[in-house]
């Protein structure tokens, strides 16, 4: 049985200078997504996607590495300045922002958009270890 020819799409270089870096920092992982101003994703990375497993995913170093890889691929599209939105209480919040700056992106604004309930759902019971 012959295999069909699969046409691979080449990633088109977009010329976008301003963008938004969404950092989702949970207690277990850190996900960094870099989008344009309209929310279309340019690049993304996470601690788990880089090969960190288990409790190593929730370290500030893993968040730093995820942020660096996402920013490098976004800078290939011509990204220069970025607004940062941070969501979640995890340990990788600050280190992910610092990694964006050290990678060469200019951070213009930092916004905390962590969802806070106005006494909505009942939280899960406390862990007893």
Swiss-Prot record:
Name under which the protein is recorded: Small ribosomal subunit protein uS11
GO cellular component, one term: ribonucleoprotein complex
Organism: Staphylococcus epidermidis (strain ATCC 35984 / DSM 28319 / BCRC 17069 / CCUG 31568 / BM 3577 / RP62A)
HAMAP family referenced in this protein's UniProt entry, alphabetically: Ribosomal_uS11
Single annotated GO MF: structural constituent of ribosome
Keyword Transmembrane annotated: no
Function statement: Located on the platform of the 30S subunit, it bridges several disparate RNA helices of the 16S rRNA. Forms part of the Shine-Dalgarno cleft in the 70S ribosome.
Record gene name: rpsK
Family membership noted in the UniProt record: Belongs to the universal ribosomal protein uS11 family.
Any one GO BP annotation for this protein: translation
InterPro entries noted in UniProt: Ribosomal_uS11, Ribosomal_uS11_bac-type, Ribosomal_uS11_CS, Ribosomal_uS11_sf
């Amino acid at each position: 049985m012959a295999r069909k020819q699969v046409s691979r799409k080449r990633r088109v270089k977009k010329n976008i200078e301003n963008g938004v870096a969404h950092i989702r920092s949970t207690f277990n992982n850190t996900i960094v997504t870099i989008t344009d101003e309209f929310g279309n994703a340019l690049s993304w990375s996470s601690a788990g996607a880089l090969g960190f497993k288990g409790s190593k995913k929730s370290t500030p170093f893993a968040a730093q590495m995820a942020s660096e890889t996402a920013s490098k691929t976004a800078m290939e599209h011509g990204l220069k300045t970025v607004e940062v939105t941070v969501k979640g209480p995890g340990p990788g919040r600050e280190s992910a922002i610092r990694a964006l700056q050290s990678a060469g992106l200019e951070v213009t604004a930092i916004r905390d958009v962590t969802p806070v309930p106005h006494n909505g759902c009942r939280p899960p019971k406390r862990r007893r270890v």
